[in-house]
Amino acid sequence: MLRLFARGHREEAVFGSLLRRIGCDAWLEEDGKQYKCSDVEGHFGGSLDGVLKKVPDIPLNAPCLAEFKTHGDKSYKALLKDGLVASKYQHYVQMQIYMHKKNLEYGLYCAVNKNDDSLFMEIVRLDRSVGEQFINRSRDIIYAKRTPKRLSESPGYYKCKFCDYSDICHFPKAQAEKNCRTCEHSFPVKDGKWDCAAKALEISKELMVKGCEFHEFIEDFKG
């Protein structure tokens, strides 16, 4: 997994170099760090790959989100055939959230096939309704008292079989770990922090992962 992340990180520099060579201005960092955005009192956010200007087919001085992705051969071919929205809607949503938060009217989706290094690029226009929809969805999930509704009641459903969280979703009572995030006494507060109602204190990162003597599973995780 670390090697996969490293490959993606290397491709960011490659894409930046390629875009500069065709005349684009490319900024991959802000003050020496990745561009970031957040919402829902700091509990939701992400990191932008960069910001571009002078992108062909985009108004000259319009800043543009840069989104760089690596794809396996099957995924890349689906992208070529069907386009971004149909084949990788989650990537499209990610871009819309970043564009909405950073007030960018355009985005450039850049994809590389890890098998043969072929490239795909697609210009994306801002649709604030999509960004707002999924930010509101994240807010509902973050502040929810119960776990979200399952995509399917069958763990054998094809999307569930490929989900990293299938076990905890379909068998929560057997899979839930004891920590503050599974405890009914914890609740999110400002600046991405969590408080404990039982102890009336802010939960540290160290305590968050192990819980305490007052731990009580939320309703969906109780045996």
What annotation goes with each model-predicted range?
Residues 21-24, 71, 100-107:
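Alpha-helix capping at helix-to-loop junctions
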Residues 27-28, 65-67, 106-111:
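A structural signal for short, well-ordered beta-strand segments and their strand-loop junctions
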Residues 78, 85-90, 97, 101-200, ...:
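Metal-dependent nuclease catalytic regions and adjoining charged, substrate-binding loops involved
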Residues 68-72, 113-114:
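A short mid-domain helix/strand-loop element embedded in enzyme catalytic domains
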